[in-house]
């Protein structure tokens, strides 16, 4: 019998499997538009840190997509809460708060990995070769952990789908464009760099891009991202405990 976090994770996988063809199409459109519009139309002849712009862009898209798709698990949780009342069933089930959070977080991380795989496949079609080493995937997984955990926590706090949309607008969208995904932060004023340095996506972009280029990765990036992942996961467990009571 499937029980604990595996039951939660398996349920989300079944939902994802049923929607996978449409999801693949949806996950492909935005990266393809970014690659064509920014990588070719605007990035021709542009060199950043010794790489073409499209080479610089793809690791940024990986960081951004792993963030957005991991965070999207929050919408799935809210649909289950508001329409199917799945959370009420969980409240009555002998499943610990940590197991529930772990199952949902793993589902969000799985979505993120699938979306990242599509971006990398598109990059190969555009002739971009990156070093997909262990550090690269560790950065993707940590980034996904942070935002999937945050999504679970916020999904327990919001009261409606409009509240969830506001979270996307105020949290995810700014980080998607200001976290070093589309341009190097060194081009911004120092005070803005200081503000952006507290964002987990900034450190995720640094890890993923440096790993993809075979460059050294600052230990600060690892510590901040891992710390954010731990804090967000514990926060999610506490919020679920409060919602369950």
Give residue spans per PLM region:
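Hydrophobic transmembrane alpha-helices and immediately adjacent juxtamembrane helices
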Residues: 1-127, 131-134, 138-206, 210-245
């Amino acid at each position: 019998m499937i029980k604990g976090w595996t039951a939660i994770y398996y349920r989300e996988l079944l939902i994802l499997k049923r929607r996978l063809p449409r999801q693949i199409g949806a996950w492909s459109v935005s990266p393809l538009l970014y690659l064509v519009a920014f990588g070719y139309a605007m990035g021709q002849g542009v060199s950043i840190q010794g790489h073409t712009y499209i080479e610089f862009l793809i690791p940024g898209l990986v960081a951004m997509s792993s963030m957005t798709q991991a965070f999207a698990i929050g919408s799935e949780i809210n649909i289950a809460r508001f329409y199917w009342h799945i959370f009420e069933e969980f409240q009555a089930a002998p499943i610990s708060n940590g197991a529930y959070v772990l199952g949902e977080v793993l589902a969000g991380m799985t979505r993120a990995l699938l979306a990242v795989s599509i971006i990398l496949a598109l990059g190969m079609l555009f002739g971009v070769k990156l070093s997909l080493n262990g550090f690269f995937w560790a950065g993707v997984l940590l980034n996904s952990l942070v935002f999937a955990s945050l999504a679970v926590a916020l999904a327990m706090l919001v009261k409606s789908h409009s509240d969830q949309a506001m979270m996307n607008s105020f949290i995810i969208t700014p980080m998607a464009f200001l976290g070093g995904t589309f341009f190097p932060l060194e081009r911004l004023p120092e005070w803005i760099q200081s503000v952006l340095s507290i964002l987990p996506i900034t450190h995720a972009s640094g890890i993923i891009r440096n790993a993809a280029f075979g460059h050294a990765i600052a230990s600060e990036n690892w510590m901040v991202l891992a710390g954010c992942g731990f804090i967000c996961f514990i926060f999610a467990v506490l919020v679920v405990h409060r919602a369950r009571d």
